[in-house]
């Protein structure tokens, strides 16, 4: 069943009402935007639409919208009256970095010259009703709907430059901690020096657990942001494409 969240995003990105739920060849498309691009909104994993998008890209420009829920408020309803009996804010927080989890199963498609990946952050209300637990690990509730409160901080990814830019813009990103930089003399490190890292260093740059950094490292490698340059113990070493390192160096200097 389609959620209010999905309906709202289709209307948000469509050129007008007539461009929602459009038939293109053998596919039903969520929307067509004002530039004529086919829009696919995918709240679930991107792997589910991988084959569809690959086929559409043969003849069309495609805009994939992958929303990330930054903040969620949970409203629990009474089963009989369907009135709200409890409200709380979910402790879980997400940001743009979480798109890497979906890209794990989308690297066969992205990047592509006719593909735009758009990642808006959402604040939403999720409406639930209690459910009897039928299995040991089954959820104790059923989600009735998800409604958008606000859409903000829309990031657009069109090529590998955009992926690396997101990494390098993290507050905890410090190129001096790369393996290549750490071997230079103190105070002599330059951003032009190739950035070599393992997933432990990447986890520090992202301020995330190492298991998450491993997912990011895989995506960066598969998309062509990095290449494997050896191992340190059991850890793979990755080097950032020199063109991207230079790009970061120029933008960093301009900001200064």
Residue spans for each PLM region:
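Short, cationic-aromatic polyanion-contact patches
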Residues: 231-256
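Positively charged, polyanion-binding regions of nucleic-acid-associated proteins
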Residues: 158-192
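Long, low-complexity, charged/polar intrinsically disordered regions in eukaryotic proteins
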Residues: 85-164
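Acidic-basic catalytic patches of nuclease active cores, encompassing PD-(D/E)XK
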Residues: 1-28, 83, 92-96, 104-105
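Conserved catalytic cores of phosphodiester-cleaving nucleases, focusing on short active-site segments
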Residues: 29-45, 49, 56, 63-64
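Short amphipathic alpha-helical interaction segments
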Residues: 208-221
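Short acidic, hydrophobic short linear motifs in intrinsically disordered regions
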Residues: 178, 192-206
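A short, conserved structural fragment
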Residues: 221-231
